[in-house]
Amino acid sequence: MPGEQTGETPTVAGVGGGGAGCSAGNSGGSSGCGAGGGGGGSGGGGGGGGDSQRSIPTPFLTKTYQLVEDPVYDELISWNEDGTTFIVWRPAEFARDLLPKYFKHNNFSSFVRQLNTYGFRKVVPDRWEFSNDCFKRGEKILLRDIQRRKISQPAMAAAAAAAAAAVAASAVTVAAVPVVAHIVSPSNSGEEQVISSNSSPAAAAAAIGGVVGGGSLQRTTSCTTAPELVEENERLRKDNERLRKEMTKLKGLYANIYTLMANFTPGQEDCAHLLPEGKPLDLLPERQEMSEAIMASEIETGIGLKLGEDLTPRLFGVSIGVKRARREEELGAAEEEDDDRREAAAQEGEQSSDVKAEPMEENNSGNHNGSWLELGK
């Protein structure tokens, strides 16, 4: 395709003196080695120009090599058995203790991205083991042949255009991820540029593309976020559909409740249009009036009881008016009974006076009278 070329690094041979060198390789992050001479043909001239530009390794590669070579840090980072790869054994401690000393940051993800820009690749997925054909134990001179890849401006423009097209085509508006263009300095620059962890995914992925063979073979890598945007739009569309169903269900429930309450309060339905907008309906006015009447009656009853208690006499704080009235009634009833008995006794006395006395009673009465007379003498 135009703007994208893949393939292995061509081997360049030239006539004259020269040495072995390495150049950054294909799209998978591998690198290949080729021979270049200082004179001779056109290929030799190109190789000589590359050696002049790659005479000094970048500080990032130098510091990384020193970390791997130092036996003091073997518990955190070290070579493998044959010295072709290096392994970060404890990423957390490595980022906390060593990265601030050498790279002025403590972000392990940034360190890994920086390795990717120099063509390092991860060997196994379950371990932080990285390899590069020009990064080997005892061959520090090969570091100058590791090229740092550049970010192509057309690739960034294509990524931005694809993201904009995906957003425009989607039905749901999604905030697009900003695309930040990082201008990477050439490999012989002394300033290290570490990609920040806040960089966009498009910019971080675009950093994989680069220049191969000192500019002779250029590869453009474009990484769009269109699939991610489509997936996000699909998820948001499903969420909107779910919320719409819930809203419809709640509206139906509200309508049923309103109808049920309207059946119990028929007057409210006629007066609904008279209520100001936003004012809630008073669905239970009768209950409120009833409660107010009950409260008023309780207050009046309490006042009456209080007044009655104030009018009755008390003994040691206890009302005795009711008991006194009961005693008066009992006394009145007893007096009436006594009166009845007296009347009955008087009637019996009158009846006994009319009865004729017996002779013995007369004699006895005479004797008694005589005795009384004798005593009187």
Curated annotation (Swiss-Prot):
Ranges of compositional bias, category Gly residues: 14-51
Region Hydrophobic repeat HR-A/B, residue ranges: 220-265
Region of interest called Disordered, as start-end residue ranges on this chain: 1-56, 326-377
Residue span of motif Nuclear localization signal: 323-327
Compartment(s) where it occurs, according to its Swiss-Prot or TrEMBL record: Nucleus
GO molecular function, one term: DNA-binding transcription factor activity
DNA-binding feature ranges: 57-151
SUPFAM superfamilies hit by this protein: Winged helix' DNA-binding domain
SMART domains per the UniProt record, alphabetical: HSF
Compositionally biased spans, kind Acidic residues: 331-340
GO cellular component: nucleus
First-listed, main subcellular location of the protein, grouped into a coarse class: nucleus
UniProt modification remark: Exhibits temperature-dependent phosphorylation.
Purpose of the protein: Transcriptional regulator that specifically binds DNA sequence 5'-AGAAnnTTCT-3' known as heat shock promoter elements (HSE).
Similarity comment: family membership: Belongs to the HSF family. Class B subfamily.
Assembly: Homotrimer.
Name of this protein: Heat stress transcription factor B-2b
The species this protein was found in: Arabidopsis thaliana (Mouse-ear cress)
Species classification: Eukaryota, Viridiplantae, Streptophyta, Embryophyta, Tracheophyta
